[in-house]
Amino acid sequence: MDALAPTLTILGTAQDGGVPQAGCGCSNCIAAFENSERARFPVSLGISDNEGGMHLIEATRALPEQLKIWANACGLDSPVRPDSVLLTHAHLGHIEGIGQFGKEAMGCQDLTLVASDSVISILEKRNLMRPFVRADYTSNGTPKLEQGGVRFDFIPVPHRDDSSDTHAIIISGEKKRVLFLPDHDDWEQTLESVGYSNPNDWFQALGATHVLLDATFWNGDELSGRDMTEVPHPTVEDTLARVQNGTLRGPEIILIHLNHTNPLNNPDSPQSRMIEVAGHSIGRRGWRIEL
C-alpha cells in the first residue's frame, strides 16, 4: 500500500459503550474481559490524505488506544495527532474523548473541527471548544471538508435528535467512496429522508464502493427488560432483508457499531455465520481501505 495514498483505517467498531461494557456480565463482555481479541472500542475512523494530513472521525473514550492503532497501521512510531476531527453527532460515545484534545491532555490549539451547528452548540455549552477552530462550510451550512485528495460530505439522517442532529459521512478518494452510517433510527425514515425506496439504490446513487453500516442490534428482542424504542436502530435482521447479497455487484457491506449484546460479537455464533454466507463482513479495528 502506497504510504501517501489516502487510506481509511477502522479504529473502533462498537456502540458507544464498547465491548466489554461497564458493569455488564453478559457472555460477550466476559469473553472480551478474558480475551482482548474479543474486545471492541467505540466506533471511530482514521483517514490519512495524500499530503500527510490525518483526519479523525468520532472522538471516543478509547482515544489514546485508537490514535496508537492508527499510527501502527500507518507505520508511525508515535500516536497520531490528527489535523482535523469530524463528528457525526453528539451522543456520548462519539464525543466522550473530545476533552482529551484540551490543555488537560494533548494541549491542541486551532485543531479543525467539522460538525453541525447543533453539535458545535453542545460542545460550546460544555466548554469543550477551546482546542478547536470550526471548519468553513458550504453556503447551506452542511458540514464538509476537502483536503489532500479526500473529500468528506455530510448527509443528514434521522436519529434520536434529543441532543443534536445526526449525519452520515461520505468519504471520497480517487479510487474508493465509503459511506459511514454508524447511527440511524430505521430504514423507513432514512430512505424517505434521502429520497430512495431501498438502500441498494441509495448506495448506487452515492457511488459507494464500501458501506460501514449501523449494526447495533441483531433483532428487537436483544435488550432484556428494556424498551428498545428508547434506543432506535434498524436491526441487522431488517438490514439483511433489504441489502442485496454481497456476492452480487454492489458495495462491500461492513457491519459496525455493535452493541455489547449483539451475537455478532461472537465470531462462532450462527448469526456471524449468516453474515459470512450473505457475503458481508463484521468490521474489526485495524482494517484499512485505500481510497
Predicted regions and their residues:
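Extreme N-terminal starter segment of soluble prokaryotic enzymes
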Residues: 2-9
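Residues at the starts of beta-strands that form the adenosine-phosphate
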Residues: 7, 53, 110-112, 177, ...
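Active-site-proximal loop/helix segment associated with metal-binding centers of metalloenzymes
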Residues: 13, 17-47, 136-227
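Pre-active-site segment of Zn-dependent metallo-hydrolases
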Residues: 19-90, 96-105, 188-201
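Active-site neighborhood of phospho(di)ester-bond hydrolases with catalytic His/Asp-centered motifs
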Residues: 56-60, 81-94, 98, 114-116, ...
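Metal-dependent catalytic neighborhoods of phosphoester/phosphodiester hydrolases
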Residues: 96-106, 263-272
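Metallo-beta-lactamase
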Residues: 108-166, 174, 278-289
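Cap/insert and terminal regions of metallo-dependent hydrolase folds
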Residues: 177, 185-288
